[in-house]
Amino acid sequence: PGPVLLENVGGAQVLANLFPDRDALARSLGVDPRRFLPELGDLLSGKTRRRGAGTRHQDAVYGEVEVPLRDLKKLPFLTYYRGDGGPFLTAGIWIVRDPVHGVNLSYHRMMIAAGASEGTVRVVSDRGTDTALKNSGGRLDAAICIGVPAEVLFTASLSPAPDVNEMDLAARLGRIDLVRCKTVDLEVPASCQMVIEGTFTGE
């Protein structure tokens, strides 16, 4: 099996099974599949460095097109099964800044609630986002990125020590250009296809 691209699902493209096996993941990260773990370990630890890798902070704000909150349901959230409580975003990369530990990347499922400007998010207890919420008193800015570089997709799935910035890990695998969000104090990869900006309100 390989990646599956559905060209038109309610007017949007849907990509599934992007990394069907370890070899596909290795190739997408520019790593020799035969030396996947040692080569990847050397890069992530900083033992070896790639030419041109690193973060570059651009003096720019993300996004040429802005979708108002009232049109949030027009974004490509999918309803997977009959009886689902609503449409879901399943592979968005969440970026938050913990006031103690710094930037954290993670995956969270998000369901659009009845209100057009609201979403319900499952946050795993005592992991990165939950810790950031606790350290911030329950109010926390977030940027949800769709269509990010493979390096970011991969490092967002890791569970390094709390003080390790997964975006910096991604930048050890390749160059990541970062731009500012419009409404929250965060940076996102410039090549994202879509960014949803919002705030955990503590309610």
Give a label for each model feature.
Residues P1-E203:
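Extended, highly charged
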